[in-house]
Amino acid sequence: MPARPARTGASRLGTALVSLSLALLPTALATPHAHAAGRGQVCFFLDTDSAGGAGHAGWAVKDTARADHYIWGTFQGPTLKQPLAMGARIAGGAWRDLSAKSSILAPSKYDFYRCQTTASGNIAHAQRTYRVLARTSYDLLTNNCLTGAGEIFRAYSPAMSTRHLPNGLGGRPNGGGLSPTYYIKTRLTSHASGWGPVNRY
């Protein structure tokens, strides 16, 4: 769904997905765990206020060559001037940079995060997929902030199959057709394995 700052135009379409969102699950306060080089990690970030409660998703993946280096980003969605744009943004650095006030994933913009550790991960594949997606056209059901994050996770680690990233409505991959709030907080709990708790950011 479009990011919180853009609540006009196509972002209002996200309200059509609100009915799909169930009551929010209890969250556990936690801090990110340090991972040694060689282990991978993928994380969803969730803003529950965007799109009338349907939510907006950001993403991050860990560089397996370094103990504390990530790339992260978001597909902020279309604007009135660019009604089909993905609104792609990307950055990199340590977790403290990711969570800094000036970050595109700053805690002031997102409410929760949820991560999964992977045995390995290819950050170059993730970056390549991001660049491809950045040139595509936004679609509310099949090509948005949530599905884009899922595509990047799949490119990063072949282990991120439907067992970990369940399909959405009508078998759409990466939660297509479902709201980010419902998918990240609820469906990853009831229909997926390997995910950590929903942490307040």
What annotation goes with each model-predicted range?
Residues 19-24, 33-38, 107, 189-201:
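Extracellular cell-wall/glycan-interacting regions and their flexible linkers
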Residues 37-109:
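Glycine-rich catalytic cores of cysteine/serine-nucleophile enzymes that process amide/ester linkages
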Residues 1-36:
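Secretory targeting and sorting signals
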Residues 47-49, 108-117, 131-140:
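Second-shell loop/turn segments in exported
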Residues 9, 16, 32, 65, ...:
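N-terminal compositionally biased, intrinsically disordered segments and leader/signal-like regions
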Residues 125-201:
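Activation targets extended, charge/polar-rich intrinsically disordered C-terminal tails
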Residues 51-54, 116-123, 138-146:
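Solvent-exposed, acidic/flexible segments
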